[in-house]
């Protein structure tokens, strides 16, 4: 009986080994595929963050010329101008790069600084309605067109960033992505707060035609 059982035992052992090898191959393929998907979405978040920062910088670059143009009108409210300059300086004090959004404290500070800047610009534009001569200024009108474009691009870029982060953060909480994220050190990304998400749904209106 021993001589007959040996071939049968060897057959099942070979089957077991083949099955284990196939299982390991499948697990390996799944893990590699999961890693590639996480890496892809991580890069999408980085790209979205980079685009958002670029659009914020474009708006920031418009402010000095806007302030200098408005300063030419002596009766213009100086406090409003000071608020804009101060808000711009607050943004400039933060070390900005795409890794910024991986630090919740820095991201919150940067988000608040940008929100404050947007609000101060809105007040500046609202008060400008009182000054027909300022609104008729060609340079001012050109700056308004550029600012309107900047605000629209910021709104789009922020929306894309929020969606990219949502997708990434959801993915790394799901199996088997969560295992890969832990092993490879992929952490949760910082997203905008609910308050800011509501704010971006309404693009600031820049209108000098009235």
What is each of the regions a protein language model found here?
Residues 9-210:
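A helix-centric hydrophobic-segment signal that preferentially recognizes long
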